[in-house]
Amino acid sequence: DKLESARTTPEADDLQAIAAAMVEQGCKNLVMEVSSHAIDQGRIKGAKYEVVAFSNLTQDHLDYHLSMENYFQAKANLFASEYAKAAVINIDDSYGKKLLKQVKIPVVTVSRKDSTADWYLAKAEIKNGLYQVEIKSKSGESLSENFALLGDYNLDNLLLAVAIVNSAGLSLDKIAPTISKLQSVPGRLESINVGQKFTALVDYAHTPDAVERVIATVKSVTSGKIIGVLGCGGDRDASKRSL
């Protein structure tokens, strides 16, 4: 069944009702996004996660949080024993490094750049429109697979996903075969084809960092001209528009 949600993270009672319905229908696992608004407003009170993960933090939602420090601390509140048993943190991000210093629950680190991380991207080469990736763990385990989702942010997400499900108990021999089957979600570099003679892509990127990453990804696989059309939603954080 598909249930529509008006928010990234539902209200506390709705969240528990959805989780209960999933259990009744035989679901064994729940993967969800927890927004900074939801943490700040107590929407995840009563929830306890096996693993929580931190990818990065860039300017967004300052109309609500007012400062990047407030925004960071709202996110950091999720990484506490009240809500989680363990954490996975991307230490390539400066706020990830900051979070690593203050969390009190067990932590697994991931990185595309730092080979001392618990999970490290040892290789990512583009061939025939696909990444050939090799991921290594500090314990000596490794996997090599094709990965179809281009862009550094997708490599970050892949590292996080591998670390999350491994921390939750899934072995690498079960994880590896699924990587080549992964597909992009709607609205993330989604191809639109109505018979035009050029490639048209739609992406949800709405922060300076996200827009920069998307353009860099498109440049890496494009030989011709790139035209970007950006929109700015009204009554939101106006300070990032000039960025």
Model regions and ranges:
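Short glycine-enriched, charge-decorated loop/helix-capping segments at active-site entrances
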Residues: 2-9, 68-69, 149
